[in-house]
Amino acid sequence: MRAPGMRSRPAGPALLLLLLFLGAAESVRRAQPPRRYTPDWPSLDSRPLPAWFDEAKFGVFIHWGVFSVPAWGSEWFWWHWQGEGRPQYQRFMRDNYPPGFSYADFGPQFTARFFHPEEWADLFQAAGAKYVVLTTKHHEGFTNWPSPVSWNWNSKDVGPHRDLVGELGTALRKRNIRYGLYHSLLEWFHPLYLLDKKNGFKTQHFVSAKTMPELYDLVNSYKPDLIWSDGEWECPDTYWNSTNFLSWLYNDSPVKDEVVVNDRWGQNCSCHHGGYYNCEDKFKPQSLPDHKWEMCTSIDKFSWGYRRDMALSDVTEESEIISELVQTVSLGGNYLLNIGPTKDGLIVPIFQERLLAVGKWLSINGEAIYASKPWRVQWEKNTTSVWYTSKGSAVYAIFLHWPENGVLNLESPITTSTTKITMLGIQGDLKWSTDPDKGLFISLPQLPPSAVPAEFAWTIKLTGVK
């Protein structure tokens, strides 16, 4: 404010010209249309990845469909049974189902009777998941929404008689959990796909009548935050018309500003084109990639869908899940952990237990995970039991094994006069010292087991280090 009695000086000509110039520049900037992406990979690959995905770090994957009815072997049951004719699958059918029983006969048994989307969403929220990806359609072709081009082979016409995709999306969004839709481009036994295959994929009957109408319908109907494409491997992206779809998705779709996609858009695309990279199932890079990536893995080591023949030894241990999460985030990736519900819509207790263990760990250590960035060093020298992340000026050292002597040795951080060291979940600063040859020594809190803030991994927070 001016002092009382002061008179304002008129703006000089130079100042007026400057203000006019700045105003005109701002008007031009605002008038410019948003960038449009052309249907080619150089243009599409140049689109910046929406920030929410890198910040999310942890998501839950759900494989659910008619394959959840036989619930044996894996979600590839139909292909192993009738596509490959594996003897063990044929024997399973002979022993458990009458002669002439077809895969389509499983459809009415996919009831989702106990599917309560609010309960699922509560579980995923308690697990600390920031996004959830649901199979809308696996390679069997059955759609978990009333697809207008999947007559009598969708969850509204057969089985549950419900819109499973829509119901789960509503529940997740009440909790501000991002919603991803998995969609298989191919269908093993669809007549039009088999016709295109017979024609060497020089025709696109299946793509025009089935794949593309479904993708556009999913986007317009459910407005997903993420599209997790799969089933691309038999054909190039030119057969799938992938670049045309993605240019529409980025330019004109209702989710153009926020949507994220993966890299499975043609046999030539994985780890090369798309939004973020999956590269392959359960991908684990050996060093920091230069592109955003995601590790997708399953609690059941041998299947993505639920299977009745799962043994306890087939279930990934809680400590291994936490370790994979930590390593993935340290290397700049997201961790997408899969569960397979039953045909009734139940998530079996051991899967719930594993998810809740992740949530409990993240409730203490999430500061080092969510919205973090890789540090200049991703793991401690000469060991794979200490991993680093960073956020702003803070560095986080996550260690997977509690040292027997209660002292953690870190060689990578360089201390300064302002260094401060704490442990997430514990009040107060930790004592530390340095050695010119061996680096930093941190005295861990001496606590009874019941007072240790987390299981499986612990986080040291360092500020004022280089």
Swiss-Prot record:
GO terms for cellular component: azurophil granule lumen; cytoplasm; extracellular exosome; extracellular region; intracellular membrane-bounded organelle; lysosomal lumen; lysosome; membrane. It is an enzyme of class 3 (hydrolase). One of its GO terms (biological process) is glycolipid catabolic process. Keywords: Disease variant, Glycoprotein, Glycosidase, Hydrolase, Lipid metabolism, Lysosome, Phosphoprotein, Signal. SMART domains: Alpha_L_fucos. It is found in: Lysosome. Transmembrane segments: none annotated. InterPro entries: FUC_metazoa-typ, Fucosidase_C, Glyco_hydro_29, Glyco_hydro_29_CS, Glyco_hydro_b, Glycoside_hydrolase_SF. It catalyses: an alpha-L-fucoside + H2O = L-fucose + an alcohol; a neolactoside IV(2)-alpha-Fuc-nLc4Cer(d18:1(4E)) + H2O = a neolactoside nLc4Cer(d18:1(4E)) + L-fucose; a neolactoside IV(2)-alpha-Fuc-nLc4Cer(d18:0) + H2O = a neolactoside nLc4Cer(d18:0) + L-fucose. The keyword Hydrolase applies. Its main location: other. Residues 1-31 form the signal peptide. Changing G65D: In FUCA1D; loss of activity. One of its GO terms (molecular function) is alpha-L-fucosidase activity. The record marks C296 as: May be important for catalysis. The modification Phosphothreonine is found at T170. The keyword Cytoplasm does not apply. Its EC number is 3.2.1.51. It is linked to Fucosidosis: An autosomal recessive lysosomal storage disease characterized by accumulation of fucose-containing glycolipids and glycoproteins in various tissues. Clinical signs include facial dysmorphism, dysostosis multiplex, moderate hepatomegaly, severe intellectual deficit, deafness, and according to age, angiokeratomas. Homotetramer. Alpha-L-fucosidase is responsible for hydrolyzing the alpha-1,6-linked fucose joined to the reducing-end N-acetylglucosamine of the carbohydrate moieties of glycoproteins. This is Tissue alpha-L-fucosidase.
